[in-house]
Amino acid sequence: MIDTHSHIYSEEFDTDRAEIIDRARQVGITHIVLPNVDSESLPRMLDLEAAYPDYCFAAIGVHPTSIGEHFETELQLVRTELERRAWVAIGEIGIDLYWDKTYLPQQIIAFQRQLDWALEYNLPVIIHVRDAFRETMDALAPYRNKGLRGVFHSFTGGIDEARE
């Protein structure tokens, strides 16, 4: 079994990270995917991947709540990283309107640019969608039947929305 989404590299796990990983192994988790949040999380995530090779695998992306006024700088880092090394996925990407709607246009731009890169690099995506189902589906519409693949995370929609 693969854990497709863990931010176990976050500071709040500093005191018991090794024990958490041991428990994950004991219950049959064979791999853990580490989705990136932004430029600040990247070093910690890469350190964890290096500490647990063949068990923890890093994904690169910019979380929608990290999209703000200077989002282009964050996206440039993602692009640079995609050119620098291999990644297991592009994520965590998407649209989140739970906390703030101020940067919705920028979230859509960032989401679609990262979707383009997923197709370019033939990588799956880790899509975060919270309180933004319609906006997310509209942003995904141009990518139907293009070979995009991946998982949804933080999905707050209902059954009918999931079927869509």
Model-derived regions, located:
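Mid-domain alpha/beta scaffold segments of enzyme catalytic cores
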Residues: 1-164
